């Protein structure tokens, strides 16, 4: 089964992609941008410039304001085993996580009227599929977050 996902990138993913661009082009973004602005950049690399620029601007926005906003669309092929993990309860939990403000796994379990242990297990499964991340706040509080903006299952 194919799955089409529109999601936000994590900070680590943005940093990694910026580093990949620097290694691939053997230069910094500022130098690459100078080539673009002075019209000395090869036409085949213009698309790369815009992608790199949007990553750098998103990262700089994060540094200045603490909010990272970079959205990508990707298509993944799920194995039959992975497809089986997308149960109705887990998809419902993913939807609830996106629409409810949950300060912890306990609060999410309360809001969805489910057992905390089952919610935690389902969140860990969704994390392995790359649909959920956990953010630690304080010493004990773990906050589940979804990076998913949109998900489409393509059955073929």
Task: Enumerate the language-model features and the residues they cover.
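A short acidic, leucine-rich amphipathic alpha-helix
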Residues: 107-113, 126
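DNA-contacting interfaces and partner/effector-binding or oligomerization modules
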Residues: 1-43, 48
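Short, cationic-aromatic polyanion-contact patches
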Residues: 79-88, 104, 136-156
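Residues within the DNA-recognition helix of helix-turn-helix
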Residues: 122
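Short alpha-helical segments that sit at the start of domains
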Residues: 64-92
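A short, conserved structural fragment
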Residues: 128-137
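Short amphipathic alpha-helical interface segments
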Residues: 88-102
């Amino acid at each position: 089964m194919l799955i089409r996902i529109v999601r936000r990138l994590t900070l680590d993913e943005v940093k990694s992609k910026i580093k990949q661009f620097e290694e691939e082009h053997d230069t910094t973004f500022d130098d690459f941008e100078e080539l673009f602005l002075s019209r000395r950049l090869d036409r085949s690399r213009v698309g790369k410039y815009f992608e790199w620029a949007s990553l750098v601007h998103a990262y700089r926005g994060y540094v200045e304001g603490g909010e990272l906003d970079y959205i990508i669309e990707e298509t993944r092929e799920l194995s039959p085993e992975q497809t089986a993990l997308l149960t109705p309860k887990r998809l419902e939990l993913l939807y609830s996580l996106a629409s409810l403000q949950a300060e912890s796994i306990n609060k999410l379990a309360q809001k969805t009227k489910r057992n905390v242990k089952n919610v935690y297990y389902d969140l860990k499964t969704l994390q392995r599929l790359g649909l959920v991340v956990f953010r630690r706040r304080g010493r004990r509080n773990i906050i589940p977050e979804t990076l998913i903006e949109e998900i489409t299952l393509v059955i073929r």
